[in-house]
C-alpha cells in the first residue's frame, strides 16, 4: 500500500522559540506570519485573551489560498499576574516595572493553541496553563536584563530559555508551554482533527 504523503504544517507565528520546539519534536513547519493586530483583540480574562489571539492568528493564515490543504498552528502567550494580562512590554520602563512587580511571586503563563485543518475547514483550540515562580533579582540585575533587550520581545517580559532563566525559581506544569507551545496539547488537538503527530514527523536525516 502506498503511504499517504505527509501533510503540510504551517506555523502562524514569527516566534523562533515556537519554531524551535516544533523542530525539536521532529516536525518541519513552514512559517507564515498572520499580521494580526494584537492590540485590537480583547477578552475578559488572560486565558481567554491568549486563546482569542491564537484563534485569530490561525484563522487569518488558514484563509490564505496558498496554505489550502495544510494544517495551520496558531499560538499566543499571556502572563496572568493577579488577573491582569501581561503580553510584551511596550518599552524598557514597563519591563522594569513588570519585573519589580513579579519578583518573589508567582504568575500563570497562559498559552492559547489553535489548529486549523484547511482541507476540511475544521479547527480546534484550547489553552495550556503553567505556573511560573519568579526569583528575586536585584534592581541591578533587573536593569541589566532590561538593557539586554530580551524582555521587550517576549510575553510577560521573561523567557525560560534565555537570560532571565536564572531569575526563575521553578515552574509547575509544561516547560514548553512557557517557551511558547505545549507539545502534549498540540498532540491532543491534532488527534481531535484525526491526525497523529507521528504522521507529521519529518524524515530522519541520514
Curated annotation (Swiss-Prot):
Positions annotated as active site in the UniProt record: 76
Any GO MF annotation of the entry: nucleoside triphosphate diphosphatase activity
Compartments where found: Cytoplasm
Principal subcellular localization: cytoplasm
Keyword list, A-Z: Cytoplasm, Hydrolase, Nucleotide metabolism
Record-listed E.C. numbers: 3.6.1.9
This protein's record includes keyword Cytoplasm: yes
Superkingdom of origin: Bacteria
Family designation: Belongs to the Maf family.
Protein name: Nucleoside triphosphate pyrophosphatase
Organism: Streptomyces coelicolor (strain ATCC BAA-471 / A3(2) / M145)
Amino acid at each position: 500500500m502506498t503511504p499517504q504523503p505527509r501533510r503540510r504544517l504551517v506555523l502562524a507565528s514569527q516566534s523562533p522559540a515556537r519554531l524551535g520546539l516544533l523542530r525539536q519534536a521532529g516536525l518541519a513547519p513552514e512559517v507564515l506570519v498572520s499580521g494580526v493586530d494584537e492590540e485590537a483583540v480583547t477578552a475578559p480574562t488572560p486565558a481567554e485573551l491568549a486563546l482569542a489571539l491564537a484563534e485569530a492568528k490561525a484563522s487569518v493564515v488558514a484563509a490564505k489560498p496558498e496554505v489550502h490543504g495544510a494544517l495551520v498552528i496558531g499560538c499566543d502567550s499571556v502572563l496572568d499576574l493577579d488577573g491582569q494580562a501581561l503580553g510584551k512590554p511596550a518599552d524598557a520602563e514597563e519591563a522594569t516595572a513588570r519585573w519589580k512587580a513579579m519578583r518573589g511571586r508567582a504568575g500563570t503563563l497562559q498559552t492559547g493553541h489553535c489548529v486549523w485543518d484547511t482541507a476540511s475547514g475544521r479547527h480546534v483550540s484550547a489553552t495550556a496553563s503553567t505556573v511560573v515562580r519568579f526569583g528575586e533579582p536585584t534592581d541591578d540585575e533587573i536593569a541589566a536584563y532590561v538593557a539586554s533587550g530580551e524582555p521587550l520581545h517576549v510575553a510577560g517580559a521573561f523567557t525560560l530559555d534565555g537570560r532571565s532563566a536564572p531569575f526563575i525559581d521553578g515552574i509547575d506544569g509544561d516547560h514548553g508551554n512557557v517557551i511558547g507551545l505545549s507539545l502534549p496539547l498540540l498532540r491532543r488537538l491534532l488527534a481531535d482533527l484525526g491526525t497523529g503527530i507521528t504522521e507529521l514527523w519529518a524524515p530522519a536525516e541520514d
